[in-house]
């Protein structure tokens, strides 16, 4: 099976998993993501949430998110709640991002391997979650882990054909950053970002961002099918 077909199948499995969770726990929207070695989310799969809203989150609000995996890496937490105390301590995030997007409560599910967070699922709703529903999220976690186990294979480093700057840009693409955000964070021009991406596409034999993310998601055994 090609890397792209395998990635498409994995995405479908995860999307189905999100849909199943939404049937067990009524949701407004949900997001699945992998967590890289820097504890940053990447490879997002969205359920009932617009690309514009997601991009707004990435560009303006992600650093303010109190439920980021990095806040829970030294704990054993597998389900985290957006408690009233957290809302009060993170008023800007709650009032400027959550409420305008009709999100009044969030529950975060963390998927771990040997205690390290390797993936997560954000559950969002326009009404508060009950304690029973949060317990249900905790109870469904083993089933989620089993369902997506094969989708969470370990990755090797990017091919040596990429420069350090190109690998950095690929990492940002996988985290969902737009060209504009990449340019701003790396302090380079937008045209330079586009030039880097063209070179990356040529070296990795892909034609767009989606294929790039799919290919770099695959373990080395799958990646060699394209070399």
Curated annotation (Swiss-Prot):
Pfam families the UniProt entry points to: GerE
Q: Name one GO molecular function term.
A: DNA binding
Listed under GO biological process in this entry are: regulation of DNA-templated transcription
Q: Which residues bind DNA?
A: 179-198
The residue range of the signal peptide is none
Instruction: Reply yes or no: does the keyword DNA-binding apply.
Output: yes
- Highest taxon in the source lineage: Bacteria
Keywords associated with the record: Activator, DNA-binding, Transcription, Transcription regulation
Question: Is Transcription regulation set as a keyword in this record?
Answer: yes
| Domain HTH luxR-type as annotated: residue spans | 155-220
Q: Which InterPro entries match?
A: Sig_transdc_resp-reg_C-effctor, Tscrpt_reg_LuxR_C, WH-like_DNA-bd_sf
- Which residues lie in coiled coils? none
What's this chain's function?
Answer: Positive regulatory protein for the induction of arylsulfatase synthesis (maoA), tyramine oxidase (tynA), maoC, maoE/F operon, and atsB/A operon which are all regulated by monoamines, and included under the common term of monoamine regulon.
Q: Entry's PANTHER family?
A: DNA-BINDING TRANSCRIPTIONAL ACTIVATOR DEVR_DOSR
Q: What is this protein called?
A: Monoamine regulon transcriptional regulator
Record gene name: moaR
């Amino acid at each position: 099976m090609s890397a792209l077909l395998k990635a498409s199948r994995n995405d479908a499995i995860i999307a189905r998993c999100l849909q199943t969770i939404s049937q067990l726990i009524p949701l407004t929207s949900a997001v699945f993501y992998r967590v890289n070695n820097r504890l940053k989310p990447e490879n997002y799969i969205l359920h009932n949430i617009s690309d514009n809203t997601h991009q707004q989150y990435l560009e303006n609000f992600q650093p303010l998110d109190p439920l980021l995996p990095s806040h829970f890496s030294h704990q054993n937490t597998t389900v985290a709640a957006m408690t009233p105390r957290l809302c009060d301590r993170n008023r800007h995030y709650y009032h400027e991002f959550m409420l305008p997007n009709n999100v009044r409560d969030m529950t975060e599910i963390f998927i771990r391997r040997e205690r390290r967070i390797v993936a997560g699922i954000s559950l969002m709703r326009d009404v508060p979650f009950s304690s029973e529903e949060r317990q249900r999220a905790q109870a469904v976690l083993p089933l989620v882990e089993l369902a997506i186990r094969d989708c969470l294979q370990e990755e090797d480093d990017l091919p040596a054909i990429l420069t350090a700057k190109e690998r950095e840009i690929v990492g940002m693409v996988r985290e969902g950053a737009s060209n504009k955000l990449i340019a701003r964070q790396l302090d380079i021009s937008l045209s330079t970002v586009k030039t880097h991406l063209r070179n990356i596409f040529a070296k990795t034999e892909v034609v767009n961002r989606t294929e790039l993310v799919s290919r770099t998601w695959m373990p080395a055994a799958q990646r060699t099918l394209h070399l």
